[in-house]
Structures are given as C-alpha cells and as structure tokens.
Amino acid sequence: MAVLRQLTLLLWKNYTLKKRKVLVTVLELFLPLLFSGILIWLRLKIQSENVPNATVYPDQSIQELPLFFSFPPPGGTWELAYVPSHSDAARTITETVKREFMIKMRVHGFSSEKDFEDYIRYDNHSSSVLAAVVFEHSFNHSQDPLPLAVKYHLRFSYTRRNYMWTQTGNIFLKETEGWHTTSLFPLFPSPGPREPSSPDGGEPGYIREGFLAMQHAVDKAIMRYHANTSAQQLFQKLMVITKRFPFPPYISDPFLIAIQYQLPLLLMLSFTYTSLTIIRAVVQEKEKKLKEYMRMMGLNSWLHWSAWFLMFFLFFLIVVSFMTLLFCVKVKKDIAVLSNSDPSLVLAFLLCFAISSISFSFMVSTFFSKANIAAAVGGFLYFFTYTPYFFVAPRYNWMTLSQKLLSCLLSNVAMAMGAQLIGKFEAKGTGIQWRDLLNPVNVDDNFCFGQVLGMLLLDSALYGLVTWYVEAVFPGQFGVPQPWHFFLMPSYWCGNPRTVVGKEEEGSDPEKALRNEYFEAEPEDLVAGIKIKHLSKVFQVGNKDKMGIRDLTLNLYEGQITVLLGHNGAGKTTTMSLLTGLFPPTSGHAYIHGYEISQDMAQIRKSLGLCPQHDVLFDNLTVAEHLYFYAQLKGLSLQKCPEEVKQMLHILSLEDKRDLRSKFLSGGMKRKLSIGIALIAGSKVLMLDEPTSGMDAVSRRAIWDLLQQQKSDRTVLLTTHFMDEADLLGDRIAILAKGELQCCGSSLFLKQKYGAGYHMTLVKEPHCNPEGISQLVHHHVPNAMLESHAGAELSFILPKESTHRFESLFAKLEKKQKELGIASFGASVTTMEEVFLRVGKLVDTSMDIQAIQLPALQYQHERRASDWALDSNLCGVMDPTNGIGALIEEEEVLVKLNTGLALHCQQFWAMFLKKAAYSWREWKMVAAQVLVPLTCLTLALLAIHYTSEIFDDPLLKLSLNEYGRTVVPFSVPGTSRLAQQLSENLRDMLQAERQEPREVLGDLEEFLVFRASVEGGGFNERCLVATSFKDRGELTVVTALFNNQAYHSPATALAIVDNLLFKLLCGPQASIEISNYPQPRNTLQVAKDHFNEGRKGFDIALNLLIAMAFLASTFSILAVSERAVQAKHVQFVSGVHVATFWFSALLWDLISFLVPSLLLLVVFQAFNVHAFTRDGHMADLLLLLMLYGWAIIPLMYLMSFFFSAASTAYTRLTIFNILSGIATFIMVTIMRIPAVKLEELSRTLDHVFLVLPNHCLGMAVSNFYENYETRRYCTSSELAAHYCKKYNIQYQESFYAWSTPGVGKFVTSMAASGGIYLTLLFLIETNLLWRLRTFICAFRRRWTLAELQNRTSVLPEDQDVAEERSRILVPSLDSMLDTPLIINELSKVYDQRAPLLAVDRISLAVQKGECFGLLGFNGAGKTTTFKMLTGEETITSGDAFVGGYSISSDIGKVRQRMGYCPQFDALLDHMTGREMLVMYARLRGIPERLINACVENTLRGLLLEPHANKLVKTYSGGNKRKLSTGIALIGEPAVIFLDEPSTGMDPVARRLLWDTVARARESGKAIVITSHSMEECEALCTRLAIMVQGQFKCLGSPQHLKSKFGSGYSLQAKVRSEGKQDALEEFKAFVDLTFPGSILEDEHQDMVHYHLPGCDLSWAKVFGILEKAKEKYGVDDYSVSQISLEQVFLSFAHLQPPTTEDGR
C-alpha cells in the first residue's frame, strides 16, 4: 500500500511539474499534431482521381521489333550477338532470328561471354549491339547439338534505348536505368495500376525495348531447330500475342508516395522534442540532487523510474491517440491519411515506438549528470540513430532478414521500417491489418509488421537493461557505484549480511569507555534520541580500503542541537549518510528512537527530517506543494497534510509565499523551505548539513532563531563551516578528524579545554606609546603575550586563568587612555574557530595540547618563532621567511620587469603555451577534432564508393517459381483441337511446376477484374500471369496475359506460352529456360557515371561540411570557458594585450586545424580521389581547408560571446555551422539544376552566402571536384568533347576562375572573412563599440546620474567618510604618486528600464601596507566597484588612479600595476597550479630567468607545494582560493584586489590564506578586500567601510567601528547545579538586577548567554562584577566579549533595500 501511495505521489509531482512548464508541454503536444496536420494538409491538397470503371488494355503484338530499331544506330548497322561463336547450333538459331525481323542487322559471334562484355564496355561502337543470345551450354565441338532442355539468356542494353531519345537534355539528371533484375516488385507498391497509361506495361520495358519480340523469335528458332516441319505448320495455325491484365475500378492517389517516403521522418520529428524533454527532466533531478534526497527519504530507485515511465507513457498515450485519430479519420470522400489501415494497429505501433523512445531517453540520461549537456548529446544521438535508415531504405530489397532485424535494434530505424511497411500496405490497397501482422507485403519481402512491433518492444527492454546496469555501475556524482559484475553477485539479489563488531545491549551507555578530559559529562536528565555505538564505514576505492569513519560512539539528546564539526573529508557527511540509510555501515550500530539503522530504516524515516547542504527544491513546485510532497513521502496521511502544511508555513514565516514557486524565492527563503521540509510531518530527528551555507548575515540569523525555536522536542544533528554558528547553536559540539571523534562538549567546555584566552585589541592614536602599553599590560597580566602590531592596531593575548586580574588592567587602561594614545580598546574571548584549529593540529601532530600555540585572529609577521616552526612542521615550509615578503623585498632592489617588445613576446609565448596545455590535457577533444572529420569523410567515401558503384544488373530467371506458389487462370473459349490440346498441356505443365492452374469458364478478363476487386492487394502476389486460347477463324490465338504490378511478368507469361508450344512439338521433356541478364555499361554510360561523379563531389562536400561543423565548434570551447570563469578578464587585468591574447589563440588553433586537414588529404589519397590527389591538387585542397580555418576560427571566437556555457556554445554553434553550411549549400546546388529554373536566384544567393565560411567551403570543394571531373571527361577524347558541346557542359581551365565551376570567389571570400571577423573581434574587445554607445548616451546618463544621486542623498554623511572625501578632493601630485590607489567620486549607473545607481560617488585612498575592507549586503555595489576598478565595467562618472595612472584613460598601464582575485575562481582546469603561476609571471613581465624562483616562493608562501603539479580541477575549494590569491600576488603588483578570497574554505585553509595576505600587506602592498566574513575583516583589515546602496556609510579600523557603532557586551556563563536546583535561576535574577535591559539570548544545560546593553559599562566594571559573582552563584566559567563587528554590520541592515536578482 505504501508503494502505491508513493507511486501516486510521484505521479502527482511529475504531472504538476509538467503542467507548470506550459511552453514545453504545449510544444510536446503541438509538434506531433503539427506533423500529423502536415500530412492531413497534403492529403487535402493532393487530389486523388477516382477511376470508376475497370481499365482494359489492348493486345500487344510481339512479332516485330519496336519501330526505333528501323533506324540504323550511330555505328551504321545493328548487330545481333551470340555466344558461343564456335557452335553451329547457336549460329543457326541466331541466323534464324535475324531472318525473323525485317530490319538490317548482322550476326556477330563471340567465343565467350567475357569477350562480349569487353566488347560492350570498351568499344565505342557497342551502342549498335541490338541484343545478345547467350546459350548456357558447353558445346565442346562445333557440331554438338542443342539439347531439348534449352537454357539461354538475353542480354539487352543496360540503358533502355527507347528512353534515350526522350532525355531532358540535362545529362546530370539521373535517368531511370537498369532492368530491375534485383527485385520482382517495385519497392513501394501502388494502389492503382503501375504506369496506367502504358498498354505495354512501361518499365522496365520488355515490350517497348523489343525484349519480348526477341525472346519469342529465339524460342521459335529453337523449336524450328528441334522440329522444323512441325514447328512451321504449328506457327501457321497459331499466333501468340501478349496483353496486360485489366485493372478493376480504383482511386489514383499520388499522396501514397508522400506517405511512403515522409511518414518515417515525420514520426521521428514528432517524438524528438518529447525525447529531449524526458532526458532533460530525468537528468535535472539527478543534477539538482533531488533523486538522491528522495532516496534518503526512502524512495526506491525502481519507483522513481516507474513514475517517470508511467507519466510519459500516459502523456504519449494522449498524443498518439490524437495522432491515430488524425491519421485514420476520413477527411474527405472516405479518404484519410491512412484510409485502409486498422486504427487499433496504428495506435499499437505508435505506442510501441513511444515506449521505445521513453526507454531510449532513460538510457541516454544515465550517462550524464548535467541536464543541458545530456539534452544536447541526446538530441544528437536521437537523430544519429535515425540516419542508418537512409542507408537501409535504398538497400531494403537486398537485405537479408537478419540484417533488417539487426538494424531494428535502433528504435528509430525500427519505427521507420514499420512506417514504410504501413505505407506499402496502404499502397497495396489493403492497409495494415491484424491479419497481416506476420505476412510480408509481397513475395520480394522477407520482413513483416509483427517483427517491427516485436523489435520495438525488444529495443525498449534492451534500453531498460542498459539503464539499470549503467545506473548501478556509474551512478554519477551522488551514488555508490556497484562493481561491474554486480548482477552476478548473490548479495545484490539476496541482501548483504553485515558483520557486527562489539554488539552491545541497546540500553548501555556508549560513551563511558571513551570518557576522558576532552569529553564533557553527559546530561543526566535528557533522553538520547540517537545512540551511535562503535560505528565504522570502510569504502572500497579501487583495490584499497578507505576509512570513512572509525569506531564512532556518540549520544545525541532530545531538545538539543548537536553540532558536528570537521574538515572536508573528516567523516561528517559519511556519518549523516549512514544515519539516513544512504549507505549501510561496515560495522557497529546506531539507534534512532530505539530503531536500528540497518534493520528498521523504514520506521526511522517516518520521523527523520533531512536538510542537505544543497536546496532539495523543484523549481516549479510552490512552497506549499513542497511541504505537501515531502510530508506525504515521509508517510503522513492525506487528511493530516493540510493542517501540517499550514502550521509549518506559519513557523517558517512563509505564509505570504505559500503559492510562490521555489525558483522565485531568495537564497535565504530557499534554505528556510529546505529546513521546513526537514521539520515537516513531525520529524523528531533532524539532520541539517550546513543549513546556512551561502547566506548573508541577516538571513543566517533568521535561520538560527528558527532552529532555536524548533529544537525543544527534537534531536538535531547539524554540521557547519561557520564556527560562530556552532558556538551559538550548539548545545553540544563534537569534532571529527580523520574519521574519529576527538572531543565533545558545550562551547564553553571546549573553549576552556582548548582556548588561549582573551584577545585585547587597542586602536592607536598618532602619538601612541606601544612600549608603555605593553609594560602596563604585562604589569597587570604577567603572562600576557603580544599578538600583533600592525597598522593602527595593537593586540594582546590574555590567558583565561588571569580573568581575576582583568578588572584592574581595564581600569588602568581606561584611566591612562589619553596619556598612552589609545583611541579605543576592546576584548573578545577565544572563538570556536580557534578551538577547531587547535583540535585539527593536535590530531595532525600528535603533540600535547599545551605545546600547541595557535596563531590567533591576526596572522602577522611579528608572530613568535615557535609559531613559524610549528607551521613549518605542519605544512612543509622549509624556510618560512623566504615567502612572498622576502621575494618582494628582493625584487624591488634587483628585478626589472620586461617592457615593450620583450613583454609582448613573453606574453604571446605564455598564451600560446596555455592553448598547447589545453590541447594536451583535453586529449579527448583533440582526438575528436581529428577523428570526427576523418570518420565522416571515410564513411562518406565508403558510402559513395558502395552506392555510386553502379553494379551491373544480375541475371534473373524468368520463371513463375521465383514468385512461390501462384494461381494461373486460363480460359479456352476456342473449340479447336489445338486450343483444347494446349489447355490440357498447360494444366499438366503447371501442376508439374507446383503452380495452381484454374480454368475460367466465362470471360477471363472479367474474372481477373472480379478477383482483383475481391482480393485487393493480395491478388497481385497470387496471380501474375494468365492465358487464353481463342479461335480466330482457322487461326488459334494464344494470349499471354501479365499482371503489370510485377516487373518481370510480361517475359514470364511469354515463357510459359512458348514452353507450352515447345512441349507440344517435342514432348514433355522439352523446355526452354530463359533469363534476363542486362549488358554491362558501355563507355557512354560510364561517362555519364563520371557526371554522376559531380554528384559524388556534392556528397564529399556535404560530409566534409558535417565534419567541419563539429570541428569548428570546438574552437569556441576554451574561449567560452575562459570568459565564463573570468580567467580571460584576469589575464587582461594581468597585462595581456587583446591582440596578443587572440593572435596566440588563432596561431595554435590553426596548427590544430592543420593536423586533421593533412589527415584528410591522406584519406583522399587512400581512396584515390583523383580530383584532389592528381596534378598537384593536394596543395589546392590544403589551401581551401586552411583558408576555411582562417575564416571559421575567428567567426567561432566572435560567436562565443553569445554563450556563457561551453557545452551550450558547442552544441548550438555546431547546429549553426550545419545550417550555415549544409542548408545553404543544398539550397544553392538544387537551384542550379536547369530543370528547376531558378538559376538566377541561385547566383544571387550564392553571392549573399559568401560571408559564411561553411558555405564557401562546401561550394569550393563541390565545384573543384565537378570542374576536375568535367574537364577530365571533356578533354579525354573527340567523342567526349562532342558530347560536352552538345549538352552545353561547362568547365574552367583555371580552377581559381571566378565563374562557376571555378572556386575563385570562394577562396577570396574566405581570405577576406578571416580579416573582417578578427577586426570585429578587436572592436568588441577594445570596447570601441561600447565607447561609441557611451558617448551617445553620455548626456542622458549625466542627467540620470544627477537625478538618482538627489534621490539617494537623504541621510547625512558619516564624519569619517566626509573627511576621507575632503582629503581626496584636494590632492597633491606627490600624494597621488605615493598612494597606490585613489578613488575619486566614482559612480556607476546601469541603463535599464528603471536606471539603477549601483555605485554613488565613493571616494577613498588606500596607502601602502594597508588592507582596506569593503563590506556590504548583496546588491550594495561592492562587486560593481571591483568591476570598474579592474576595467571590466565602464565608469559613469568620477575616476580612480592606480600608481598615478587613470583607470579611464590608461587602463593598460593600470593593469600592469594591479593584481586581482575575483569572487569566483578564475582558474583554468586544464593547467596545473605551477603552470598557472608561471603563465601569470610571464604576463606580468618577470624575466624568464627569475620565473621559477618567483613561482617556487609563491607556492611555498601559499603552502601549495604538495599540489603544485596537480591539475587545478583536482584542487579543493581552499586550494583554489589560495591559487587565485597567488595569481593576484605574483609579479608584485602595487594594488591587489581580493573579492571574497576565502569563500568556501574550511577554517584551517582560511587561516593559511589570511597569513599569506597579511604578509603581502606587510611588504608594502595596498590591498582591497571584500568579504561576507566579519572575522576575516577583523583579521586582515587595517581599515574598512560598510557600503549601503552604493555609498559608504562608515569608515575606519574594525575596533574604531566597534567602539563607535557597537554598544554593550556578550556574556556566556556556566553555573554549577550540583545539589542546588535553583542556582541557575538565582544567577539569572542577579544578571537582570545588575545589568538592567540585559537580554537572555539562549539557555541550555546550566548555561546562559546574555546580551548586556549600555555604553556606560566599562570593561573593568563588567569583569569586576562577574569576578565577585563567580563564587557567590557557583559560576564554573564565564566569558565576556565586546559586541562583534558582525553586529555593527547588521545594524546597517535596515538601510539596504531588498536586492534584485542580479545582485549588483
């Protein structure tokens, strides 16, 4: 029942998501109906003609050759050839035949058939051969007689001559050639008579070509040879004529041709979009990790697939029902698209195809984890699986059954063949019926409709198996892969028995064994919601075991938040995955509310709430729907859902967003909803993985409040990288390292165990006395330690055990504040971050905790030597002083950076090597660049060779037995003895051949019309010939009737009659077996095939364009990637010139293009394509290809600006290349055919399309080939020259001629295009177009700026900000040169519907050795400021100066003095850390001899040496940020911009980065930094400003801002409660009384957290009061901190309006 409920829920979810994507759903419905509509429109447009009466044809005489043989051939006389020439019998018979006809001809004997074939092929007079009679007997002697069982074949001209004189005059048009001896019926049957207007039956021309006349003459000559006198007498009494079967009333319907050819394509196109949608939808859930989350909530994988399958099946059912209706409904006069087919069978066929399409889409989806890439590749694969049908269709009649079935393993080919069969059955007149399921269309065919349906279902099953297997073995990023042979393992099917280590009773206390000094005592009065006992997890990575967690034992209590901390890889996520049942544990137990995780997961999940690190939200479900969906998934009953959802919305404060889709929610609201999903349905156990990641300070606070409210009756496990979050939320904090639990206890307990004490920070006045301060501090607190002395701040560490001395210290400092030159001072207690770092170091070094002296907030150069030694030990820095600082000092003295030409050459080399590294590392792409063109061309040349090789028609025996068992009606209206005798002999002869003779007593033709009407299309296969014997006076007339629906029935009918006569004359042993074996092609026909080589050139060009479409697109990938990750911008900021950047790329890409081009020449040589390999034309082809490369590569660069994702760029540019090349090429080529009469338009379009390199390449290759073959033929002989003149076939002596078919204009165009596209590229890159636009908009923008500034200037300006502005507005030249960065009234307005003032007149000077922090909420203008300062955005007004150079006018010089670390890592995944630093060192102009030393120093300073030679893509987030910072620092730029440099780093990595930045600052660099981390700003910044709505609202040192804007203190205290129940209450009452207005922030487990307000409270007073209260109230421990910088920051929150999505 639960399964059914889950399935229904998933179907509801899928249906809702589909319903919300209105455009997609409409398109999915519309496209199939559109294509069905096209067929209906064609059905209505194409007029069918009703023929109400039977069509009866006249008799055809076969006594004489057709009239055109009366005219002599070009050679002079007709020749009648025979083989073998040495046989007297053969000669006699041939001479007899010659005398039979009244035309002038001579007999020509050949000793062997090979000689005859050579004569036909190579003798230019061979067109005079009328026919050849070849006897299939070995005459050993000339006198050998002809046996009674005669076998011979007739060989007529390959090209049917009666058509020769009716040609269109265009030799390039393909004539209907050959005798169709490979098939008995046409590929597509017709519902009416084949060639209804031809009494002689038309193609292949047995009567009009004289074949029957010759056949009858030879047969008569054989009879005369064996019975001369009797034969003579018989022929006098008898006449043989032929006649075409009459045809019953019919409807002539040309529409059926459209059905036969277009139905497969239209069906494929109908389902394409839906297939792509399926792929995208399924992969999107995987990409967004929704599938993994639903699995954690207890959803089975098979249910997930089943729900998708059912949903799409039901959708397809609706679509195909409509399609069937449109196909089968009568649109006019009882005519439909499929008039005769059974609608239920059509529906069954379409459903089978739908099922296979769904399965195919599922299969494709398993190979990808990115939805856009999956859809792009899926689209390509979907089309690609249809292309084999293009090869199958023309060869259908030649293919064996197994080949057809094999090709049907591609569902699109199976569908196409099924649609083709439907078309054939419709043309046959019966339509497809259930009774025809196992019957082929005709005797030629060996394939039936039932096999199509079977193959479609088999395909679905196979694709399903592949889906199941691939998902298990390659589950993607978020699953556990099975071994490749998992399906052979019994454990997969039967479950895996688990080894239980150290099984204990559930009730026992798991932590007793582990209790030591770092584990705080367990709370006695609380219930453990989660008990973890000796839990371990080992992962198998290759052949090695990797320990995930080891022997974890921990209790988590109800009503508490337990915070789990640890570095990346410490085991936090593994622990959560085990507790949620995503992986099974290797050993140990965990109990959640008494249920064991290995056995009772279904029960556990009912009360489990999960909030993964990422938002588990469906873009198109509303807030309420999410809560409803997940509540139901957890098992909440349908009746309770509405109330639960309503309550949860209230708790989350999201009532007003109830019906808003999740994609429109802000980041903070999304996290709230994710937490709501975890809370819903009464989840008693919550697991929250970094619930506030990616949120700003305001949103984070809101989540903290929510969790504090909701924890009362729940067990909460939370992980975080924010230590302040752990400090504030964690009732108990557990720290994991290397998979093992290191400590556990309250925040206060851990700080007491691991903390260093208090950090006291003093802000100095200009006349400050640091020595005096230091003496005073050490006098009161002897073991105090100087922490840092940098900028305007001085900081000390005061040990915690000295708190009783703090009152006197602070009192003395307050008293002597002015005397010592102290502007302000404050203190903060040890943070959780320090605890965390210390635990990590303890694990890493196995040192005693007391021996670890942790560098505190300020990571500065003045740290003690022991600190350096420790870091060296930890990080492998052998000589820490020789870091960035040392390098800088050294360089300032010795190093002169390259400039001018040397710098440009160095930068060119750096950029060139970057491209080379990309090709080297992305070898798969390089392989594709080479293999795709080679494969395309090779396949094309193979296909051309295979298809254009016009094989000589094979021999076909003209016998009824070829058609299987047939009915032969005959009538004997004649009463003569001869007629009776002939009819009896006919019966005997047919029965002997196992045919079915049927005597018709009435009129034979009426009988044939009646049977054809009754039997429909089946009649044409069962009845092929008929005979009648009439008397006409003394003469008996034997009529051989033939059913013209079969190609060879005329000759077969005559063969039966002639055999009948022969047997009458010579007895039953006599027989004549005749075959049709067309002649081989002669010179003229081969010449025509040379002209078809023109078509071959077209095919080569077409395939080359397909190959180049894929190859050319690859040149956009790196361009888009570099721009998307901002690496290109950072390279420009690092000093590289636009021309250097693009020309180096172009040079490498042209070299890359040259490789496949040369290999293409090898392929042409291998296939011996003369046009490109003879007469030095290889050089011409290489020139064409390289000019194409020169033109297309800059075009790809230019078009890369339209895309922000490399995969999208690649797929869409490939489509662009295909359309701009193939579509235009085909269009122009078709219009050039004279018969189309659009030659003038084709010339115009050809000139228009010259701007497209793809079109130029296609036309150039095609024209070159055509010109070569035409010229070669037309100059080969006088006869060829005569034909060329006669048919006006043109060629050019010079291949580079401007006129067609020369390639001059295409070559010129490609050469010019490259230059034009590069010019456009530089115009865009140098912002010339933007500058023009800026100039035009300048006046309007100034007015807008003034108006916007008036609007925003409401609040009075802060005094510090005003003073900074006034200093900058009156600058001196010296101060400008000495100050690394001056920002002067900088403003930015974005032109949009409502103009946005992003930055408003900010002014600032950053001095040497200063680190300036830029703080602000999202949308405050920080990033816009950075973009203007680095030249990425234009400046609206104001200016900025770097080293005295203006950003507006000297951006090139400015960039040489600037380092930049963008917010998101602008790194190139294909390079190593060392390679990137070397590249940027070159860009900065560091001399080559010094680069290695410089890079080594940077790596050492960044602690990146162990990772230096690893690819950047393998780096952790922290290492990437370090490398980004290193790039900003290398080359010693005067000003360094760091945009959120420590985002996503764990605390250890963050500290190391701070250290690097601090050392750079101390070396004299000016640093500007933005950050969301207030702690980071306190650690690094000497001054900072808070930005609101584009303006500075305050400015000064961190301590100055805290003293100016902050008020009050933060107090945490732990009270002993042993033996005294109300001790805590007494202490709370004391605080309320002593500190009026104090706010109780949090209370848990004998701990309280207060905010103490008031500016009048001094540090001395606070410590004095608390020291006295310590004994009186049993206070175990307490800590006091000044209000944090974060609280100052939050005090400005109300001034910032809600941000727009662009977050400027």
From Swiss-Prot:
Family annotation (InterPro entries): AAA+_ATPase, ABC2_TM, ABC_transporter-like_ATP-bd, ABC_transporter-like_CS, ABCA, P-loop_NTPase, R2_ABCA1-4-like
Coiled-coil parts of chain: none
GO BP terms in the entry: lung development; organelle assembly; phosphatidylcholine metabolic process; phosphatidylglycerol metabolic process; phospholipid homeostasis; phospholipid transport; positive regulation of cholesterol efflux; positive regulation of phospholipid efflux
Site (Cleavage): K174, E175
Tissues in which the UniProt entry reports expression: Highly expressed in the lung and moderately expressed in the kidney, adipose, macrophage, and spleen.
Any one cellular-component term (Gene Ontology): alveolar lamellar body
Segments passing through the bilayer: 22-42, 261-283, 307-327, 344-364, 373-393, 405-425, 447-467, 925-945, 1100-1120, 1144-1164, 1183-1203, 1213-1233, 1245-1265, 1310-1330
Gene Ontology molecular function: ABC-type xenobiotic transporter activity; ATP binding; ATP hydrolysis activity; phosphatidylcholine flippase activity; phosphatidylcholine transfer activity
Database matches in SMART domains: AAA (SM00382)
Catalysed conversion reaction: a 1,2-diacyl-sn-glycero-3-phospho-(1'-sn-glycerol)(in) + ATP + H2O = a 1,2-diacyl-sn-glycero-3-phospho-(1'-sn-glycerol)(out) + ADP + phosphate + H(+); a 1,2-diacyl-sn-glycero-3-phosphocholine(in) + ATP + H2O = a 1,2-diacyl-sn-glycero-3-phosphocholine(out) + ADP + phosphate + H(+); ATP + H2O + phospholipidSide 1 = ADP + phosphate + phospholipidSide 2; ATP + H2O + xenobioticSide 1 = ADP + phosphate + xenobioticSide 2
Effect of E292V: Knockin new born mice are healthy and survive into adulthood without overt signs of respiratory distress
PTMs per UniProt: N-glycosylated. Localization at intracellular vesicles is accompanied by processing of oligosaccharide from high mannose type to complex type. N-linked glycosylation at Asn-124 and Asn-140 is required for stability and efficient anterograde trafficking and prevents from proteasomal degradation. Proteolytically cleaved by CTSL and to a lower extent by CTSB within multivesicular bodies (MVB) and lamellar bodies (LB) leading to a mature form of 150 kDa.
This protein's record includes keyword Protein biosynthesis: no
PROSITE patterns: ABC_TRANSPORTER_1, ABC_TRANSPORTER_2
Residues that bind ATP 2: G1416, F1417, N1418, G1419, A1420, G1421, K1422, T1423
Cellular localisation: Endosome, Multivesicular body membrane; Cytoplasmic vesicle membrane; Late endosome membrane; Lysosome membrane
Family: Belongs to the ABC transporter superfamily. ABCA family.
Protein name, as recorded: Phospholipid-transporting ATPase ABCA3
Lineage start: Eukaryota, Metazoa, Chordata, Craniata, Vertebrata
Gene: Abca3
